[in-house]
Amino acid sequence: QAFDDVVIAAADARANKRTHWDSPYHSFASDFKNGNKHKVFSYTPYDQTLLLDIDYVMMNDSLKWVFESDMPVAMYHQAEDLIRQPMPLPQQHLSTHGIPMVWSTAVYFDKRHELTKLFFDVWEHVGDHYDFYKFLYGFPGTMYRTDYCVSIANHILNGMGHGELINDLGVPMINMSQHDDIAKINSVDEWVFTVNDRKENWEDTLALIKRENVHVMNKRSLDRHYDTIMGALDG
């Protein structure tokens, strides 16, 4: 048995198209259903919960420590690519001179803290008034992003300034670009990636990721290696 509890909820009804990339040369659009992500506060039957995006591949147990902490809420405050370079500016701040990005890829929270409910209420409020906050904070695009919602909620709860009310998970999140690809799955906890050069798209670098957690942004790369991944899990 893989799960003790399964909660099934209807997807948010808002239209939210996202352009995805599978290498620098091919793009496609699909529905991006993330409008009810903040509702995990009411969905979870547990006091302590670690919410993970479905494309966040866990190759170690390095986040277990959060369950022994006294933090109300924690997320990644920094991200880097597969070769440990900082993410491009649009992934570091909401706009050129905007507030720092906080990532909703992994969200730890403890419902027993008063601040936790307040955080999720502010997250919902920002989502309900997304166009207003887009104008106020000057972030680009038309797609609804929960990263923007939690970043703004963090900013508001810190008195419209920098602060640590929303804790950092302590290390940068490793983030795979949609221009990157999975080259080979050696085992459950050892993957080889091709890392596309940001300036010279014809050039790739191989990167070995071993026993580290990775946000796999190129969804079709996961699909291409599905059988190998499932076989490794079964093996």
PLM regions: where:
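Conserved beta-strand termini and adjacent loop/short-helix elements that scaffold enzyme active sites
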Residues: I8-A11, Y76, L165-D168
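Active-site-proximal specificity loops/subdomain of glycosyltransferases
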Residues: A2-T44
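A glycosyltransferase accessory/donor-loop signature
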Residues: N16, T96-G235
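Short, polar loop motifs at secondary-structure junctions
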Residues: Q1, A11-D12, V57-N60, L169
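Short glycine-/acidic-enriched loop or helix-start segments at secondary-structure transitions
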Residues: R18, N60-L63, L118-F119
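Residue-level detector of flexible, active-site-proximal loop/helix-junction positions
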Residues: D12-A15, E80-L82, H113
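GT-A fold catalytic core of metal-dependent nucleotide-sugar glycosyltransferases
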Residues: I8, K33-Q85
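Short, P/G- and charge-enriched loop/turn segments at secondary-structure junctions
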Residues: H26-F28, P90-H97
